[in-house]
Amino acid sequence: MALKNFNPITPSLRELVQVDKTNLWKGRPLKTLTKGMSKTGGRNQQGRITSWHRGGGHKKLYRVIDFKRKKIDISAIVERIEYDPNRTAFIALIKYDDGEYSYILAPQKLSIGDRVISSQAADIKIGNCLPLKSIPIGTTLHNVEMKIGKGGQIARSAGTSVELVGKDSGYAQIKLRSGEFRLVPLDCKATIGSISNPDQKNINLGKAGRNRWLGWRPHVRGVAMNPVDHPHGGGEGKTSGGRHPVTPWGFSTKGKKTRKNKRTSKFIVKKRK
């Protein structure tokens, strides 16, 4: 996919850069593989804001994605590549030889008419899903499981991938884009190739309204608030906050580590850069 630039006939078009979606399916998604979504506006069940700056946005249908690739040893053909408003990657509608349809994450270079399969010993080909023990070292992967049978969790967003760098003592060692090296059980599945839409990182929304369409509300600075609302609030005239940057709840920000799950830290061989 390429990037689209626009003639600056309006101010919002001057900086706008979008991903070219001319080769994607232009119709509606398959109805049997969609679900309705209700908006939360960033509120929890008590009505309190738990995710700031969320709200509004265009209506969406959730596309049910098969992250587990649970139909084993049944070949499928790629019917079409589609846009999915719920993720940055594109998705592929595949039709199995037994007639069932499914959505999967579309890797780069996957085309309409290609055949894919999930198997214990499939060919090392774009879109095929195999256990890590059956994949040669040096292969580029996406949608990698962390727990056997749970479904892919690693490398699912646009343009991402991991590299298989080693196997030892029942675990595969993978290198993530962040520079982290992590151990994953050899029986976990992964799909061959990199995720589609690598140009997502180069887009420019061009105007605030386009962010509102995506469900994002304005980000208000703490120094622009009152003291009751934020530790940086208040002061006579414009101030710089007067302290090291903190969250609205007083915790240090700007690089403070937030990872709590020590239980799985033993699987991280080398921390990210």
Swiss-Prot record:
GO cellular component terms, A-Z:
large ribosomal subunit
Q: Which Gene3D superfamilies match?
A: 2.30.30.30, Nucleic acid-binding proteins (2.40.50.140), Ribosomal protein L2, domain 3 (4.10.950.10)
Q: Name one GO biological process term.
A: translation
Quaternary state and partners of this protein? Part of the 50S ribosomal subunit. Forms a bridge to the 30S subunit in the 70S ribosome.
Where is the sequence biased in composition, kind Basic residues?
254-273
UniProt similarity note? Belongs to the universal ribosomal protein uL2 family.
Mind listing the UniProt keywords for this protein, alphabetically? Ribonucleoprotein, Ribosomal protein, RNA-binding, rRNA-binding
Q: Which PROSITE patterns match?
A: RIBOSOMAL_L2
Fetch the InterPro entries from UniProt. NA-bd_OB-fold, Rib_uL2_dom2, Ribosomal_uL2, Ribosomal_uL2_bac/org-type, Ribosomal_uL2_C, Ribosomal_uL2_CS, Ribosomal_uL2_dom3, Ribosomal_uL2_RNA-bd_dom
Region listing for Disordered, in residue ranges:
228-273
Q: Any keyword RNA-binding?
A: yes
One GO MF term on file is: structural constituent of ribosome
Tell me what this protein is called. Answer: Large ribosomal subunit protein uL2
Q: What does this protein do?
A: One of the primary rRNA binding proteins. Required for association of the 30S and 50S subunits to form the 70S ribosome, for tRNA binding and peptide bond formation. It has been suggested to have peptidyltransferase activity; this is somewhat controversial. Makes several contacts with the 16S rRNA in the 70S ribosome.
What SMART domains has UniProt attached to this entry?
A: Ribosomal_L2 (SM01383), Ribosomal_L2_C (SM01382)
| Native species | Rickettsia prowazekii (strain Madrid E)
Short name of any one Pfam family annotated for the protein: Ribosomal_L2_C
